[in-house]
């Protein structure tokens, strides 16, 4: 009997271990995908307007300055809780009006403040973008961001 591993035993351990961990990786990937699609996505709230708002978010590259749930740039405020910060849970109409007014106003020359570009959104585009921001507020982000101001 050999004192150590033979080449064939080492090869079998390597291939067996590789196959085991590959299958484990594939199973965890499939489960993660299933969980995201069936459990963690608010499919009922995912309306055409929310999808259109996401397309506006992407088309105007908002993520180059803002972040949602920590993903994106940190040049401008976090927006995953902007609906809550504007009081959307208590007064949705006032929150919609406040967000639309803020996005449209963009005061120029404010000392010590970064400037957001002025976007010429139509009323429908603005409504869709706000619907998207409202939808992101409903994502279970496990209390991220920790600071209420984003």
From Swiss-Prot:
The record's Gene Ontology cellular component field reads:
plasma membrane
Q: Does the keyword Transport apply?
A: yes
Q: Does the keyword DNA-binding apply?
A: no
Q: What is its main location?
A: membrane
Q: Which InterPro entries match?
A: Cyt_c-like_dom, Cyt_c-like_dom_sf
Question: What is its subcellular localisation?
Answer: Cell membrane
Gene Ontology MF: a single term = metal ion binding
Give the matching SUPFAM superfamilies. Cytochrome c
Query: What membrane topology does this protein have?
Result: Single-pass membrane protein
Q: Which residues cross the membrane?
A: 13-29
Which cysteines pair up through disulfides? They are none
Positions contributing to heme c binding: 62, 65-66
Keywords in alphabetical order, please. Cell membrane, Electron transport, Heme, Iron, Membrane, Metal-binding, Respiratory chain, Signal-anchor, Transmembrane, Transmembrane helix, Transport
Question: Which superkingdom does the taxonomy of this entry point to?
Answer: Bacteria
* Assembly information from the UniProt record: Heterodimer of cytochromes b (large subunit) and c (small subunit).
Q: What does this protein do?
A: Component of the anaerobic respiratory chain that transforms nitrate to dinitrogen (denitrification).
What name has this protein been given in UniProt?
Answer: Nitric oxide reductase subunit C
